[in-house]
From Swiss-Prot:
Domain of life of the organism encoding this protein: Bacteria
Classification via CDD domains: LbH_UDP-GlcNAc_AT
Covalent S-S links between cysteines: none
UniProt gene name: lpxA
Similarity section: Belongs to the transferase hexapeptide repeat family. LpxA subfamily.
Protein's name according to its UniProt entry: Acyl-[acyl-carrier-protein]--UDP-N-acetylglucosamine O-acyltransferase
E.C. designation(s): 2.3.1.129
Function recorded in the entry: Involved in the biosynthesis of lipid A, a phosphorylated glycolipid that anchors the lipopolysaccharide to the outer membrane of the cell.
Family matches, as Pfam families: Acetyltransf_11, Hexapep
Keywords: Acyltransferase, Cytoplasm, Lipid A biosynthesis, Lipid biosynthesis, Lipid metabolism, Repeat, Transferase
UniProt-listed InterPro entries: Acetyltransf_C (IPR029098), Acetyltransf_C_sf (IPR037157), Hexapep (IPR001451), Hexapep_transf_CS (IPR018357), Lipid_A_LpxA (IPR010137), Trimer_LpxA-like_sf (IPR011004)
Length: 258
């Protein structure tokens, strides 16, 4: 059974699964689907086309699925898809996509999106990510699984943040951040790898040691990116984590943060 506060406004075309809660003064617009067990707090605005999965919690004053402010957007049908078990805290804004890209903004599963964070149009957020308060992602940004972006991190459009990467507070990211890399500063500079995060997630000492050596190859030996990638080729055949690091560099379109 759903629990809908009588002061909420639910469009007749919205689809709410069993166990959904909607708080007072929230608005659920046309073409919005909400999965089982999701809790919508007070004063939340959901605009479609938006699909929200199961067992999410969205806190007050969040705006989810609004039109993009991209000046090229002319009202074309685009959407937002949010997975399961996400926590979206107070005042978060997430925009739908544009037809110039994927026409979809995507948020995966088990993410924590903290107060006043912004996810721009056509962005893709993986699983188990943390976006700390006031983090702002421009359009077309990709964030890999388990990445952590500390408070007030700013990410330029089209940047890719690799899996397990970490940014310090107030970091301004203008280039891609490879998997596992820790960046700080404005503009961002690579400082190390997220070894503490690896330990917490059960990475073996051997893998951490190998990744440490690979980081030094890319960032401490004065090699070009092309030459560093050649040096990573052999260890990448033995360790999938190194291959993940290598591929995140190889696939970079904007160049990597160094």
């Amino acid at each position: 059974m759903n629990s809908i506060d009588p002061r909420a406004i639910i469009d007749p075309s919205a689809k709410l699964a069993d166990g959904v809660e909607v708080g007072p003064w929230s608005i659920v617009g046309p073409d919005v689907e909400i999965g089982e067990g999701t809790v919508i707090g007070p004063h939340v605005v959901l605009k479609g086309p938006t699909r929200i999965g199961k067992h999410n919690r969205i806190f007050q004053f969040s705006s989810i699925g609004e039109d993009t402010p991209d000046l090229k957007y002319k009202g074309e049908p685009t959407r937002l898809v949010i997975g399961d078990h996400n926590v979206i805290r107070e005042g978060v804004t997430i925009h739908r996509g544009t037809v110039q890209d994927r026409a979809e903004t995507t948020v995966g599963d088990h993410n924590l999106i903290m107060a006043y964070a912004h996810i721009g149009h056509d962005s893709v957020i993986g699983n188990h990510c943390i976006l700390v308060n006031n983090t702002a992602l421009a359009g077309h940004v990709h964030v890999g699984d388990w990445a952590i972006l500390s408070g007030y991190t700013l990410v330029h459009q089209y940047c890719h943040i690799g899996a397990h990467a970490f940014s310090g507070m107030g970091t301004a990211i203008g280039k891609d951040v490879p998997a596992f890399v820790t960046v700080f500063g404005s503009p961002a500079e690579a400082r190390s790898m997220n070894f503490e995060g690896m330990r917490r997630r059960g990475f073996s000492d051997e893998v951490i040691h190998v990744l440490r050596r690979c980081y030094k190859i890319v960032y401490r030996q004065g090699l070009t990116v092309e030459d560093a990638l050649k040096e990573l080729a052999e260890p990448a055949t033995q360790h999938p984590e190194v291959e993940l690091f290598r591929q995140s560099i190889l696939s970079s379109a904007r160049g990597i943060t160094r």
